[in-house]
A protein has these predicted regions:
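Aromatic "clamp/platform" in nucleotide-sugar-dependent glycosyltransferases that forms part
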Residues: 268
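A conserved mid-protein helix/loop that constitutes part of the nucleotide-sugar donor-binding site
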Residues: 16-24, 196, 200-219, 232-235, ...
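N-terminal strand-loop element at the rim of the active site
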Residues: 8-70, 152-155, 160, 167, ...
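A short helix/loop element that forms part of the nucleotide-sugar donor recognition site in Leloir-type
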Residues: 46, 178-191, 327
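Conserved acidic donor-binding segment of nucleotide-sugar-dependent glycosyltransferases
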Residues: 300-301, 305-312, 320-325
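Short hydrophobic beta-strand element within catalytic cores of glycosyltransferases
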Residues: 276, 285-288, 298
Length: 364
């Protein structure tokens, strides 16, 4: 079969699971190229970008900006005209808005939802309405719509976006990170050696709700917590963290998950949380709020504990795992085995290849 030329478009490749998901697909499938903007502000670019061929879209950013977005559209049009892709594969809302708005073309369109913005409290009601209407219209221009988790797909279809036959789910393929001895990892990150550590790792933005972790920690002053990540809330979280919470900013995930004993997520909204899968592959039990596809990663009572966003429930879950080393060990082992089975790189890449072949065989 001839090489399928795929142009992937994403607004920015900031540190996180989405960037790694996209990079792995681009890197593994011949004929793939990545078009992306620049990471701005407090965030930094994911190191995975260095492994793939990148075309920079100078004026493409995450926020809506009519002037810059028009310039970005022109840039994207020029890239498409020069590259002549068989498929334009957009990722996340902003890139999907721009990449799917261009008229005509001989190429097929695919869009991947790595989550959605309907539960993001940083967006106004009007902004969410604009997003919903845009997604409904743009879905009609796609040959295929992909979600990274089944729950996310259900929530999008509930908004009447796309037709049932337009959707497939492709879970991420996640590689186990290099493992380090706990003592060495804690030395690397300047963490205490004699405590059970509860680790939180994410972007420090409102949708990840780091403030909820601080509420939990305040109720458990005898438990040690460590928070890793950067973002616009980093300084305020540092300033308000109680004494039993160490906020270390950006951290190498391989050392972080090797250093802690329990992983926790307090997000208000999620797609498919790759960081939690990495934590499971590191043999950690996971506590996660029941949002997005978290419950597809964490099997409640078997590989960790899934809770509501209630402080009381999160406190109880942390207290239970901190007090029970045998339970932590059993859940961690079960989580590692399940993550290896459910989130293989081979499965993710094969599913994308099949998706590309499928859309090229259709008329739409």
């Amino acid at each position: 079969m001839c090489t399928i030329k795929v142009l992937h478009i994403i607004a920015r490749m900031n540190v996180g699971g989405t960037a790694r998901y996209v990079s792995e697909v681009v890197d593994a499938i011949p004929g793939s190229v990545l078009a992306t903007g620049y990471v701005q502000g407090a965030e930094i670019e994911d190191s995975s970008v260095s492994a793939v061929k990148v075309i920079r879209i100078k004026h493409m950013g995450r926020k809506i900006s009519p002037f810059n977005d028009l310039l970005a559209l022109v840039e994207i049009y020029k890239v498409i005209r020069e590259f002549q892709p068989d498929i334009v594969h957009t990722h996340t809302f902003k890139a999907g808005l721009l990449g799917r708005s261009l008229p005509g073309g001989q190429y097929k369109r695919i869009h991947t939802f790595h989550g959605h913005l309907f539960a993001d409290q940083s967006f106004s009601t009007l902004a969410k309405e604009f997003i919903t209407i845009s997604e409904k219209l743009l879905a009609n221009r796609c040959a295929l719509l992909i979600t990274v988790g089944a729950k996310v797909g259900e929530e999008l279809r509930a908004q009447e976006i796309g037709l049932d036959q337009d959707w497939i789910s492709i879970p991420p393929g996640v590689k186990a990170l290099p493992h380090h001895e706990k003592s060495a990892a804690r030395t690397e990150l300047l963490l205490p050696h004699d405590a059970v550590l509860v680790g939180w790792m994410a972007r420090m933005t409102s949708v990840k709700n780091p403030a909820l972790l601080l509420e939990v920690a305040a109720r458990l002053p005898e438990v040690n917590f460590v928070m890793a990540g950067g973002g616009d809330l980093l300084e305020s979280i540092k300033a308000s963290a109680p004494a039993n919470v160490k906020v270390i900013g950006w951290s190498d995930a391989q050392y972080f998950w090797s250093a802690v004993d329990i992983a926790i997520s307090t997000s208000d909204n999620e797609g498919m949380p790759i960081a939690l899968i990495e934590a499971q592959l590191a043999g950690l039990p996971v506590i996660a709020t029941d949002v997005g596809s978290n419950a597809e990663v964490v099997e409640d009572g078997q590989t960790g504990i899934v809770t509501s966003r209630s402080v009381d429930e999160l406190v109880a879950a942390v207290a239970q795992l901190v007090a029970d080393k045998a339970l932590r060990s059993a859940m961690g082992a079960a989580g590692a085995e399940r993550a290896q089975r459910e989130f293989s790189m081979h499965q993710m890449i094969s599913a994308h290849k099949e998706a590309y072949e499928r859309v090229l065989a259709t008329r739409r």
